[in-house]
């Protein structure tokens, strides 16, 4: 069984400008790539789990999302960071057409994490969810991951978020240091 870091995207890995779907508007948060590289060296799989309601709302197409995701994946790979899995939810209960759905994959539900756990043979009791919203943490809790980490690089941290997070960090950049300290 593998251990993994489940990663939200917008506000965790990249600056959240709102419905980011174009390469020109995608900017990694300072230090994120180095942190991801360090987490890989520590033996963690890196698994992206991202809600993309902009697809359901008609703000951008699934093809536009996939094009940006492919670019992001290549950008990381060029810097020795390989994502082991990419999972996304294009649905929203108030969406349009085929994407209007109250699904099991949209965080705070745990469907994306549970699918990754099954497909990638991940041990949730050795794994971590990192995100900038309560919904991210609730998905991690529902999937029974070992640790849920809230980062301050996206949405404002709420009291509810602080209450359910195992750690609240300024950025994912701080996570490798915390994990090394806990290992001692």
Swiss-Prot record:
Binding site for substrate: 8-10, 16-19, 50-53, 106-107, 133
InterPro entries in UniProt: HAD-like_sf, HAD-SF_hydro_IIIA, HAD_sf, Heptose_bisP_phosphatase, Histidinol-phos
GO biological process: ADP-L-glycero-beta-D-manno-heptose biosynthetic process; carbohydrate metabolic process
Protein name: D-glycero-beta-D-manno-heptose-1,7-bisphosphate 7-phosphatase
Family affiliation: Belongs to the GmhB family.
Site (Contributes to substrate recognition): 106
Site (Stabilizes the phosphoryl group): 50, 107
Obligatory cofactor(s): Mg(2+); Zn(2+)
UniProt key word Disulfide bond: no
Signal sequence interval, chain numbering: none
Source organism (scientific name): Haemophilus influenzae (strain ATCC 51907 / DSM 11121 / KW20 / Rd)
Coiled coil spans: none
Encoding gene, per UniProt annotation: gmhB
GO MF annotation terms: D-glycero-beta-D-manno-heptose 1,7-bisphosphate 7-phosphatase activity; magnesium ion binding; zinc ion binding
EC id: 3.1.3.82
Compartments reported by the entry: Cytoplasm
Keywords: Carbohydrate metabolism, Cytoplasm, Hydrolase, Magnesium, Metal-binding, Zinc
């Amino acid at each position: 069984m593998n251990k993994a870091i489940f990663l939200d995207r917008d506000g965790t890995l990249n600056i959240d400008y709102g419905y980011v779907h174009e390469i020109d508007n995608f900017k990694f948060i300072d230090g994120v790539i180095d942190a991801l590289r360090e987490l890989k060296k520590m033996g963690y799989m890196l698994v992206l789990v991202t809600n993309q309601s902009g697809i359901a709302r008609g703000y951008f197409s699934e093809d536009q999302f996939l094009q940006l995701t492919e670019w992001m994946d290549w950008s990381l790979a060029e810097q020795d960071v390989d994502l082991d899995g990419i999972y996304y939810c294009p649905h929203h209960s108030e969406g349009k057409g085929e994407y209007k759905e109250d699904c099991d994959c949209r965080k705070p539900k745990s469907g994306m994490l549970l699918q990754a756990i099954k497909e990638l043979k991940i041990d949730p009791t050795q794994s971590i969810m990192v995100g900038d919203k309560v919904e991210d943490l609730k998905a991690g809790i529902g999937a029974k991951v070992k640790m849920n980490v809230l980062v301050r690089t996206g949405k404002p941290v709420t009291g509810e978020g602080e209450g359910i997070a195992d750690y609240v960090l300024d950025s994912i950049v701080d996570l490798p240091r915390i994990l090394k300290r806990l290992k001692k």
